[in-house]
Regions:
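TPR/TPR-like (Sel1-like) alpha-helical repeat modules
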Residues: 1, 77-80, 96, 106-126, ...
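Extracytoplasmic and endomembrane cell-envelope/extracellular-matrix remodeling and assembly machinery
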Residues: 1-41
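Inter-repeat boundary and helix-capping residues of tandem alpha-helical solenoids
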Residues: 11, 18, 47-52, 69, ...
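Structural motif corresponding to the intra-repeat A-B loop/turn of tetratricopeptide repeats
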Residues: 28, 65-67, 105
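Intrinsically disordered, low-complexity segments enriched in Gly and acidic/Ser/Thr residues
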Residues: 45-46, 50-57, 61-66, 70-86
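Solenoid-like repeat scaffolds
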Residues: 2-11, 39-49, 78-88, 117-125
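"A position-specific structural signal for the A-helix of alpha-solenoid helical repeats
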Residues: 16-20, 55-64, 90-100, 130-139
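Single-residue signature of alpha-solenoid repeat helices
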Residues: 34, 71-72, 111
Length: 143
C-alpha cells in the first residue's frame, strides 16, 4: 500500500502532470528525456504551487547527468527555500542531498550544517528514513 499516495488522495492533492511525467522518466533511467521534459516548462506560469518539487526534480536529474555540483546545490537550495514549511519531502531531501555533496567534497562543516537543516524539518512524508540518513551522515563526519 502506498501510504503517501493514499494521504495525497485524501487531501485531494494532485501533482502537476508534467512533474509526474518527469518523475516517471527519471525513475525509469531516462535522465536526458526527463531533463528535456522539465526544461520545456515556464515555471512561473505553470508551477506556482509546485516550486519545491520542480527544483528538487531538476537537481536530481542534473545530478544523474553529472552537472556541476554548484549548479545542483543551487537547485536543491531553491527547493529548500520554496518548501521548508511544506508537508512534502522535497525540502528535507534537498538538504540531505546538499549535505551528501558537501561530504563528498570534504566540506564537513557545510555538510554538518545541511544534515542539521534536514533534521530541523519535520512532519513530512518519509521523515523517518530521511532523518535516519541525515543522522548517519552526522555520525560519519563527526567521528
Amino acid at each position: 500500500e502506498d501510504k503517501v499516495a493514499l494521504k495525497d488522495a485524501n487531501k485531494n492533492y494532485i501533482t502537476h502532470s508534467r512533474l509526474l511525467k518527469t518523475r516517471l522518466l527519471y525513475d525509469g533511467g531516462y535522465y536526458e528525456k526527463a531533463l528535456l521534459d522539465i526544461s520545456g516548462v515556464k515555471i512561473i506560469k505553470d508551477y506556482s504551487g509546485f516550486y519545491d518539487e520542480y527544483w528538487y526534480r531538476l537537481a536530481r536529474i542534473k545530478s544523474k547527468l553529472n552537472y556541476d555540483d554548484k549548479e545542483i546545490i543551487e537547485n536543491f537550495q531553491l527547493s529548500i527555500d520554496q518548501g521548508k514549511n511544506s508537508a512534502n519531502y522535497y525540502a528535507p531531501m534537498s538538504a540531505l542531498q546538499i549535505a551528501l555533496i558537501y561530504e563528498k567534497q570534504n566540506e564537513l562543516v557545510k555538510a554538518a550544517n545541511y544534515f542539521e537543516k534536514c533534521l530541523s524539518m519535520s512532519d513530512f512524508d518519509y521523515e523517518r528514513g530521511i532523518h535516519q540518513k541525515a543522522k548517519s551522515g552526522l555520525v560519519r563526519i563527526l567521528d
